[in-house]
Design a protein with these regions (language model features):
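Arg/Lys-rich, positively charged N-terminal/basic patches that mediate binding to nucleic acids
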Residues: 1-38
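Amphipathic alpha-helical interface surfaces
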Residues: 6, 30, 34-37, 57, ...
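Short, solvent-exposed polar/charged micro-motifs at secondary-structure junctions
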Residues: 15, 59-62, 107-110
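Short, contiguous, well-structured surface segments enriched in hydrophobic/aromatic residues
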Residues: 33, 37-53
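A short, surface-exposed loop/turn module that caps and links secondary-structure elements
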Residues: 46-69
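Enriched for short, Lys/Arg-rich terminal
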Residues: 69-113
Length: 113
């Protein structure tokens, strides 16, 4: 599949393995997991090919994240992306964000308590 990056820091992480800005610094294990996810997207001919990688835990997101899908980088981070199918039925993947899901889970826990 073809892969594009919505934000510059995501492209830098893929190309250089690090970012120049101080806001988006990640642990080396997170970066290697991110690279593994991007390579899986690049090697897949279609979205269904991602199901064979059980460790990536591919899923379509629901609720306020409807329209996005995700791959699990590790227990703490996930890679969110948008699947775009063009007129010739080819899928383009636009990588949107690298999310720390522990923050999201703790916020939901606070709201539901």
């Amino acid at each position: 599949m073809n892969v594009e990056f919505e934000k510059e820091y995501l492209a830098e992480l893929y190309e250089k393995g690090k970012t120049d800005d101080k806001k988006h610094r990640f642990h080396p294990q997170i970066i290697s997991g991110y690279l593994k996810c991007v390579k899986a997207l690049l090697n897949a001919y279609r979205i269904e090919d991602l199901y064979q990688y059980k460790s990536l835990n591919y899923e379509k997101l629901k609720g306020d994240k409807k329209g996005l899908s995700s791959l699990r980088i590790n227990d703490q981070y996930r890679l969110e992306f948008r699947e775009i199918t063009n007129a010739s039925n080819q899928t383009l993947v636009e990588i949107c964000s690298l999310i720390d899901i522990t923050i999201i889970i703790s916020r939901n826990y606070e709201y539901n308590s």
